[in-house]
Amino acid sequence: MKKTLCLLLAALLVLSLAACGKQPATPTPDPTPDPAPNEAPKLVEALIPAEEYPDIVWENAGGGPCWNENYIVTVGNDSSNSKTIFYSTNRQTGETRSTELDGLWISDSLALYGDSFYWLTIEANKETGERELLLLKYDCATLEKTTVFTEPCEYWAENSQLAIDDEWAIYVLTLSDSEYEIRGYSFADEKNHTLMKLESSIFPRLVQMTDGCYSVALQESDGWAARIIRLADDETVWENRSESTRVPTRLAFNESWIVLREESQADPNAGSLRVWNRTTGEELNVDGLKGMLYPSSELYLIGDWLYSTRLVTNEDGSQRQALIRIHLPGDQAELIYDGDVFRFRVDPMTGEIAVWQTYDEPSQNHSTTHKLILLKAS
């Protein structure tokens, strides 16, 4: 018994001495923290491969594009006869069909829903000569045309927008330099309804969301204010009034974020970016993003990513616009398309980006030439 006890004590002594001589485990260092929101994130390359549907080079590229999982619909100009052409491309087969436009082209008046695309236009009545506003529906596969509605047009609608869902065709009409009317054509009662009127020196933008259609209005009738308005019930769901020296110029939003760009009236290039968390209502400090984006570029959101462009210097000293995205609240920035971006548009529904890239070889008549490229956002 004593012998067994001695052996146990000896074993414990050995273990104790070993423990005393053992070096303490090196603690695992914490991962490098993300930069604070007021520090500029480093721009890293995360280039997206391009899918070119359709592979068409346009001179004076027109409106659109509109696209979904099955089709891409675009508008381009045929310089040989000064005609405007619709292009409808089947994304599964790559087949492209085209048809010449009837009526007057109105900027941004093209919308795609299901297997049909809709076009808002103005043309003269063949019998009376009076101007009429028409909403036309085209089958994407056959390009068969149907007139949805026709009504007298006593105003000039140089710019418009069009949003389509199961119940409504919603569009914006320009009544004067600062007066706009948002109307909705109900597919149920087959009538047009005035949804709201507003005064603004900046054209209001329609935003199609999963829960309905919204208007982004940047108004100045009673001082500069940026508003997000739900058209179904004419409710202002968010509003921000700017200082008298600041002008709101771009506004993007989704379920999580609101991003507003303001410009200085004294210096349009001295813009600032403001970001709000929609869940908490808190405005974030994003001073580090100042100067990262091209001042007049569009803003789009997909999830927590903000898409815009920035100026990049070429080897010869010239500059081009490259497409970038910033992870909100401003902790990461990625260069995702390094071409010379003329315009771009993001579709949150499909998570894709349409880019108009300035074409390398100018056309013979020296008009601006662009190529449409469709990119995956993820």
Label each PLM-derived region with a short phrase:
Residues N90-G94, Y138-L143, Y185-E190, R230-D234, ...:
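Short loop/turn segments that connect beta-strands within beta-propeller blades
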Residues L15-A19:
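C-terminal motif of bacterial Sec signal peptides marking the signal peptidase cleavage site
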Residues I72-V75, Y118-T121, I170-L173, Y214-L218, ...:
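Residue position within the beta-strands of beta-propeller blades
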Residues S80-Y87, N125-L136, D177-G184, S221-I228, ...:
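Structural motif
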Residues L47-W58, E95-L101, E144-P152, K191-L198, ...:
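A short beta-strand motif characteristic of beta-propeller blades
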Residues V57-E69, L104-G114, E154-D166, E199-T210, ...:
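Repeated scaffold domains used in trafficking and secretory/extracellular systems
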Residues D340-S378:
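Blade-level signature of beta-propeller repeat domains, shared across WD40, Kelch, NHL, RCC1
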Residues C20-E127, K145-Y155, H370-L375:
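N-terminal "mature head" segments of proteins
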